[in-house]
Amino acid sequence: MRTLFIGDLHLSADRLDITQAFTRFLDTELDDADALYILGDLFEVWVGDDIALPFALELAEKLKQVSQKLPVYFIHGNRDFMLGKQFARAAGMQILPEVKCLNLYGIETVILHGDSLCTLDKAYQRFRKLRSLSLARWLYGCLSKKTRQGIADKIRSNSKSSNQQKSYTIMDVEPNAVDALFAKTHTKHMIHGHTHRPAIHQLANGCQRIVVGDWYEQGSVLSVSAEGINLQSLPFEQAT
């Protein structure tokens, strides 16, 4: 048996090929799975459970079917932080806190989306702090659907433009932030996404940091079992 981790699928109505590949992954890759963890940014944008698009509702039905066979866990990302309990119930997903510690086959491991580790990106961290406020989230939820969609589109546009101007270092995790989280959680193994740079990092202090990749051009799946770990890419044609 094994536990699977994915993230950064960025599903949208504009890229139904990704949704199709993910659906086939759910159909073919979970027979021997103990659990599935989705580490954020399942959707490209999420402005509220009351504005779920048809493709998202269909996906919820598929995830619900999966959840009847094995637990499906979800951690919010920077794109879908407004995904709420209503959609999670429809999809059979259990929403986890921003940082979660697990015992994976005897190994204490901390999992998260990963954006909180990119501390050199000061502008984004200010936005992240604001959006985490309950009052800000409540006020946003009170806005009309059209207004929320407009704000989301503006944020996406600004983010894309800003990211093109940021350096590689700023966009990646900050080593001190990584070390601090290891110390805080008393773990030596970490799994996250967000940076879209899949890799297995063996750190000098004996810790291990694994990054799951995005699903823009191919799938990225981390499999963890008692025998070890396997970070693999999943070509879309292989998932069809």
From Swiss-Prot:
Q: In which pathway does it act?
A: Glycolipid biosynthesis; lipid IV(A) biosynthesis; lipid IV(A) from (3R)-3-hydroxytetradecanoyl-[acyl-carrier-protein] and UDP-N-acetyl-alpha-D-glucosamine: step 4/6
Q: Where in the cell is it found?
A: Cell inner membrane
Q: Where does substrate bind?
A: N78, R79, D121, S159, N163, K166, H194
One matching Pfam family is: Metallophos
Reported cofactor(s) = Mn(2+)
The entry's free-text remark on the cofactor is: Binds 2 Mn(2+) ions per subunit in a binuclear metal center.
> What does the record say about its membrane topology?
Peripheral membrane protein
Top-rank EC class of the record's enzyme: hydrolase
Positions of Mn(2+) 1 binding = D8, H10, D41, H196
Q: InterPro entries in the record, alphabetically?
A: Calcineurin-like_PHP_ApaH, LpxH-like, Metallo-depent_PP-like, UDP-diacylglucosamine_Hdrlase
Listed EC numbers: 3.6.1.54
A Gene Ontology cellular component where this protein is annotated is: cytoplasm
Keyword set, alphabetical order: Cell inner membrane, Cell membrane, Hydrolase, Lipid A biosynthesis, Lipid biosynthesis, Lipid metabolism, Manganese, Membrane, Metal-binding
Residues annotated as binding Mn(2+) 2: D41, N78, H113, H194
Keyword Amino-acid biosynthesis annotated: no
One annotated GO molecular function is: UDP-2,3-diacylglucosamine hydrolase activity
Query: Would you kindly state one Gene Ontology biological process term found in this protein's UniProt entry?
Result: lipid A biosynthetic process
**Catalyzed reactions per annotation:** UDP-2-N,3-O-bis[(3R)-3-hydroxytetradecanoyl]-alpha-D-glucosamine + H2O = 2-N,3-O-bis[(3R)-3-hydroxytetradecanoyl]-alpha-D-glucosaminyl 1-phosphate + UMP + 2 H(+)
Q: What does this protein do?
A: Hydrolyzes the pyrophosphate bond of UDP-2,3-diacylglucosamine to yield 2,3-diacylglucosamine 1-phosphate (lipid X) and UMP by catalyzing the attack of water at the alpha-P atom. Involved in the biosynthesis of lipid A, a phosphorylated glycolipid that anchors the lipopolysaccharide to the outer membrane of the cell.
Q: Mind telling me which HAMAP family this protein's record contains?
A: LpxH
**Which family would the database say this protein is a member of?**
Belongs to the LpxH family.
Protein name stated in the entry: UDP-2,3-diacylglucosamine hydrolase
The encoding gene? lpxH
